[in-house]
């Protein structure tokens, strides 16, 4: 038995879990939020204990140091050498990283080379990788790429209708994201439905503050809604999703915005927040909608309508759908969103059992329907730990 740590570093946060492997038991988990601020929050839970501290944490490097200190101070581990592997979620791997890999100096350079494609995420991922390699030099470090699962998408689905040379020379194409989550829930759904993954046509809806839909055939991604960056596809918490590209020069040339202002608007002021004018959080939108707020209702109709557009297109492309999956914060916890989506898909044979949906059952479709509608809680950290386990076993055997 050995210990594997899974790390998910965001732009101002660091999510962590330690698993004992190969049993996949969670030893400790937690979240460090508001990194860079004087009132950063350190949360950690283990063995029925919960720790919450508010303190200054200036950067991700300091966050890692504090985390390792706390693990020892609370005797979650006695020595850092007990951690044999650390897995890092990396948002964007470009075309060079088609699977998880052991981190080397060359791998770090490769991740840095595509930082401009995920400027909010990759820099934090890199800092986490470098700090853990420095503080845990004997643990194997593994990079797990959000884009890797989508490397099976065929060329006709990942190319943009731009001059082909832009792909050949500059690798401008659809990459897709949330791959670790989509891969996990597809495998879990196969277990729940007691069917071989290789024989299933699955449409996975990862719906959180970031959101994407993925078509999965025989366990492989064949299309997904996000694109060159995580801004494409569905409208999201603060992201616009896909828009007519000529809106951008119009905003610059006719309305006087700078390009930086437009990009900030599209990534931080649009989506659910921009349309509703209320919040980027769907919980707030649902409350406002129930109170009759017209823009909150409009936001819900837009969001669920866009989801259904992708589901319909992917079901058509795969010539069917065996399972429709809802996962992530909104997908797992919003009966209203699930109901609004499934109500628009009756032509596919999709149903939603009201009682099962409201109770959050794992299978919420009617029993006799061919298309199984499932709520599958995602577990990206476990997927990361499993990938690390493959490499860590080689070093400790």
Swiss-Prot record:
Xref: NCBIfam families: ackA
Site entry: Transition state stabilizer: 178, 239
GO BP: acetate metabolic process; acetyl-CoA biosynthetic process
Protein's job: Catalyzes the formation of acetyl phosphate from acetate and ATP. Can also catalyze the reverse reaction.
Reactions performed catalytically: acetate + ATP = acetyl phosphate + ADP
Binding site for ATP: 15, 206-210, 281-283, 329-333
Chief location bin: cytoplasm
Tagged with keyword Membrane: no
Family as reported in the entry's similarity comment: Belongs to the acetokinase family.
CDD domains: ASKHA_NBD_AcK_PK (cd24010)
Subunit and partners: Homodimer.
Keywords: ATP-binding, Cytoplasm, Kinase, Magnesium, Metal-binding, Nucleotide-binding, Transferase
Binding site for substrate: 89
Pathway: Metabolic intermediate biosynthesis; acetyl-CoA biosynthesis; acetyl-CoA from acetate: step 1/2
The protein, known as: Acetate kinase 1
